[in-house]
Amino acid sequence: DFMAIVLYSDYESIGTVETGSELVNKLISNIEWGMKGNFLDVPTDCPQRDERMGWTGDTQVFSATASYLADTYAFYRKYLYDLYQEQLLAGGMVPEIVPTFGPTKCSCAWGDAACIIPWNVYLFSGDKTILENQIESMKAWVDYIRRIDGDHHGWRQVFHYGDWLALDRTGAAAKQRVWSD
């Protein structure tokens, strides 16, 4: 026998979904526990690996789901403050990881966290203060892109992750394995 203690940032659960499907309910439970496993001071990218870094792209993609499941206002307010502090040091660029640990780069979607996360938190909370607090960060990100883009479309010429986890076509056998009991 063993006991585990789950460490995560304090937040109040406010939403969930229950269906008539045991498999879908298990998926929802896994999402809720995955969020707990990834919300410890900063939103980390994946609970199954040792990396545990605050990838901005991952958290911006999950921010609406997180805000549906929990009151994320205080958690994201703190994270967005940290993001802006890193952004100030990088001349408006939003690092791909916050907090950063040395030299970093940015990418579309990852840097867009500066605009998408506050917007999602606002949509779910109705509190415009998050937008007021982050407007300088949002503007700095857009200004950074404009500055890099310049007259020669430089933004298109720098590194971007793109859709690095695109789903490829799968055959009937793979689909059957996924959906069978």
Task: State what each model feature region is.
Residues 3-30, 36-37, 43-95, 105, ...:
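Active-site acid/base region of carbohydrate-active enzymes
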